[in-house]
Structure formats: structure tokens, C-alpha cells
A protein has these predicted regions:
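Short, exposed beta-strand-loop hairpins at the edges of beta-sheets
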Residues: 159-163
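Basic, often amphipathic N-terminal segments
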Residues: 1-71, 93-150, 168-177
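Short, basic/glycine-rich phosphate-binding loops at helix/coil junctions
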Residues: 78-89
């Protein structure tokens, strides 16, 4: 059986912005905070191919993709249709298309059949998980009222899997295109 692997991109941001995101995650998503640092998930829980094939594919996509500048200015409610829980996301307006295109490029070739077509992709950094959607909505509304501004860039993608409650890296690939 193939391992369950993810591809993420860690944002490069001002240290104060990363500290703010980390503080929000520690307060509102302790499980995610302990698992992995702030990130955009690009490939979700994939076990469609062996690790060597997966890594080679991600390396090839990264080699032809340029670094992606982004700017998150919106805290968005992410409701879970299968649970009363809900999430708070930081969503980029600048960089949205480029991150989405990177996601789409990763789900080609050997990963093409692994893409979930029933869930639209929204690039985001999860900053909270709440017991109810109204709680998440209230948190997002407060952030948006105060003003959200997190500029940065994505310069690499990381492949990894969850091992003993931690995201263990299997490879890092710079965006070189």
C-alpha cells in the first residue's frame, strides 16, 4: 500500500505576520498548530501512487512553476458539510489564481485521478477550527472588520506525511519556473 502523502507550501512572510498567524492557530486550532506550521495545502491526503513517483512528479511541476507572490486580505468561513465544526481561513486575493493553477498542475499525470472534483479548491491558510459555523463566522467577521493584510510569497513546495501526530517532510522543491 502506498503512503498517504500531502504537498504543502509554507508562506514566506514578515516575521510579525507569521507570529500573528501562529498565535491565531495556537488559540483556535491546537491540533493543526501542533501538526504542521502555517501553510497552503496543495495536494490533500493522496495515496494514489508510490512515494518515488509522487516526489518525481512534484519536482517536475515545481521546476516549471515560478515563485508566487500573494496577499491575504480576507478571513473566510470554511463550513464542513459533514460536521457541525467550521474553519477560519486566510484567503489570498493576490496570488489566488497562481496558487490554484499550481494546485491544478500538481493534480495532473500520476495524480490526475486523485483530485476530488466534488470539492472546489480555495487556496487558504487555516487559522482556526471552531465547534460551530456561527463561532467561525464571528471570528472571521472580527478579523475582517479589523483589517487583514498578510503579504508574502510561496517559493517552494514540501511533500510530507503525518507520522505520530507530526508532519514529516519527505522532500522540498523550489519553485524555479
Amino acid at each position: 500500500m502506498n503512503p498517504t502523502i500531502y504537498t504543502v507550501a509554507y508562506p514566506e512572510c514578515d516575521a510579525r505576520d507569521l507570529q500573528t498567524i501562529d498565535t491565531w492557530r495556537a488559540a483556535n486550532d491546537s491540533t493543526g498548530h501542533a501538526l504542521v506550521r502555517p501553510h497552503f495545502t496543495l495536494v490533500f491526503a493522496c495515496n494514489a501512487v508510490d512515494e518515488a513517483t509522487y516526489l518525481a512528479h512534484v519536482a517536475a511541476v515545481a521546476a516549471r512553476t515560478a515563485p508566487i507572490p500573494f496577499h491575504c486580505r480576507y478571513a473566510m468561513l470554511g463550513a464542513d458539510a459533514h460536521s457541525p465544526r467550521a474553519h477560519a481561513y486566510l484567503v489570498p486575493d493576490e496570488g489566488y489564481a497562481a496558487l490554484s493553477l499550481l494546485h491544478d498542475a500538481l493534480y495532473t499525470g500520476p495524480l490526475a485521478d486523485a483530485m476530488r472534483l466534488d470539492l472546489p479548491y480555495t487556496p487558504h491558510i487555516t487559522v482556526g477550527t471552531f465547534e460551530t459555523a456561527p463561532q467561525a463566522r464571528k471570528w472571521c467577521a472580527a478579523r475582517n472588520h479589523a483589517g487583514v493584510s498578510v503579504p508574502g510569497r510561496v517559493a517552494a513546495v514540501w511533500v510530507g506525511q503525518v507520522v505520530d501526530g507530526q508532519f514529516e517532510h519527505r522532500g522540498q522543491f523550489g519553485l524555479m519556473g
